[in-house]
Design a protein with these regions (language model features):
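Long, internal low-complexity/basic segments
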Residues: 5-30, 243-245, 263-315
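C-terminal, low-complexity/hydrophilic appendages and adjacent surface loops
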Residues: 90-92, 169-265, 308, 314-315
Length: 315
């Protein structure tokens, strides 16, 4: 976690998680036990899923039912010396399954096109088969792409057939500052009356200087992420601004699929690539988030989310 190029948010998250879940020494036997538990959770989930599928068969609904299977996150499970899911963009955490079973199409075919959870609603609407004008009316103003047209020949769809990249955003206050997490847990354990608990929690203030917010884009070849203070929402336009206000990761997913070598450690060598990916991230952020000014954040006493570049240096 202390290797050069690792964002400080990785270690801070693991420290905060230790507060909530307990210490987890870096020992092989402990990682094996964690993975054993995780795999058994998956097996248990599969058994419940199997029960649903069997019931569809019993009700003779299988050939009249579209099934969509996905998840909200994975488990780091020891990868990169991390566990849980939090302040990172590693594939073990954010690359989740997306399986669509449609009775009108053959199964067991993989599609390599990039998708995003924003695409779920447009896809579900697309799978209804209703008139296009009605679907467009229902989806008016919504973000995301309809992946249902790819079902006919998913193996033929290119990497960017649906979208130029997949956007990932993260900003979880509870895990941004381990000391804040410890104070939060202590208060939670005191079992105060609800009103007193709310007042006590409101008096706590995490250290917003920690760069725990994440904006990431995966274009299929490269994964680019910047970690920033949640009090410093901004759209970097230059390399200097990017490096000054962010911890940066850049992975070559073709030549480094395990994401072990952060190319952003050599910013001058990869200047052009960094700025290309930064521009892609900015464009996708504008398209799918809009004005990324932090206004979605909950209120804290004295907090101000939409900081200008000049104001950022005060924090």
């Amino acid at each position: 976690l202390d290797e050069p190029g690792r964002p400080a948010a990785h270690k801070e998250y693991q420290n905060a998680r230790a507060v909530m879940e307990g210490q987890f020494p870096d020992e092989d036997r402990r990682w094996r036990k964690l993975l054993d538990y995780y795999f058994n959770c998956i097996r248990d989930n599969d058994q419940h899923l199997e029960a649903i599928l069997n019931e569809l068969d019993n009700l003779q609904l299988t050939q009249n039912t579209i099934i969509v299977f996905t998840a909200d996150h994975g488990e780091l499970g020891g990868s990169h010396q991390m566990h849980g899911k939090g302040s990172s963009v590693y594939k073990e955490q954010i690359h989740v399954p997306m399986i669509i079973r449609h009775p009108a199409y053959p199964g067991n075919i993989r599609c390599n096109s990039l998708t995003n959870h924003l695409d779920l609603v447009p896809t579900l609407i697309g799978l209804t088969g209703r008139d296009r004008s009605l679907r467009e009316k229902v989806l008016e103003g919504r973000k995301g792409r309809d992946m249902s047209p790819l079902l006919a020949h998913p193996e033929q769809a290119g990497l960017n057939a649906l979208r130029p990249g997949s956007l990932y955003c993260y900003g979880m206050i509870l895990y941004m500052d381990a000391q804040y997490t410890a104070k939060f847990r202590k208060l939670a354990g005191e079992k105060l009356p609800h009103d007193q608990f709310k007042k006590a929690i409101a008096s706590l203030h995490p250290d917003f200087s920690h760069r725990s917010g994440i904006r990431m884009i995966n274009d299929g070849h490269y994964k680019f992420a910047r970690y920033f203070s949640l009090k410093q929402h901004h759209i970097p336009a230059t390399l200097a601004e990017l490096l000054e206000n962010n911890d940066v990761e850049l992975f070559d997913l073709v030549n480094d699929p395990e994401e072990n070598h952060n190319l952003a450690r050599e910013p001058e060598k990869y200047r052009d690539l960094l700025m290309t990916m930064n521009d892609k991230l900015n464009q996708l952020t504008a398209a799918e988030i809009g004005e990324d000014d932090g206004s979605y954040m909950p209120p804290f006493e004295g907090s101000q989310w939409d900081l200008t570049a000049a104001q950022m240096h005060q924090y």
